């Protein structure tokens, strides 16, 4: 039973993406190039937004793959507070971690692009979920938080009852009756969020929901 967004957040329903998994891409460096070479790193986000992580210019001290990789990782991390991306480097592999808020978006296409001027060389692997890359997993809590915040935006003085239930063997939506009884009959409008990962909506679901409401 919530009287505000703050109540929901106190119950753990936040929009901090704590339950998400960040996507991870990798770049395996095969040649460290020469002093003055440039490496520009860009990532395409939803709606075609291109985030430029910056252009690193190699220096004399980048005299091996290991040294160059460490320098680029440090360069990326210096801008994390601005762009939200971070990097680690080991041996010849630079791992780029995407912001959790992007969810599953980086899992398809080629969001990471690296443009080189000079003789630095490497191979990109997008977040495929193999070979030390990681596919992103979207936050469910952020979705719940959004719907709750929209409820209170439209009705600041409203009272919202929220219930989470395990996956049933049969979708009869008895949970609706449970919610109404818990509220002592005060619920006047109800919404059902069905996790599509477990079960896709069918016309039979609508019939079952109507049965619960009608009785």
Annotated model-derived regions:
Residues 2-50, 55-215:
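Polar low-complexity, Ser/Thr/Gly/Ala/Asp/Asn-rich disordered segments used for subunit assembly
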